[in-house]
Amino acid sequence: MRDYQRKKNNKYILPGAVYMQTVWTIRDYQRMKEEAVSLLLSSPPPPDGQPKGTGTGDEVASKAFRREEILRKIKAIDTALEAVPREYRKGVWGSVVERKSFPRDADRTTYGRWKSRFVFEAAVRLGIF
């Protein structure tokens, strides 16, 4: 399924680059969740015994900053998805993340409107737009 933004009867229009960046950030959701968990479980490599190393100054702080940024993005996507009514969430999520067609339980335009709003809300909350 092609990635395009609805143009007619859509008050949630984004610039093309912003739209695609937001869609790909949403598609990266599962990897971000896995990375947030792995940052908690990872440990630095053992020291090599030399007095001066080539590593960064504070690896724990840099991992903490990285994890906070990932969690901020995850929360922004979750909050944007909550703006979609519960009965349409699965269809909208499947359309954006898994590129599935919309379910047949509601009209395609209804799902399209909610998908547009979801992507717009995610772009605003992620700070992309």
For each feature predicted by the language model, list its residue ranges.
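Helix-turn-helix DNA-binding module
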Residues: 98-110
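DNA major-groove recognition helices of helix-turn-helix
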Residues: 107, 111-129
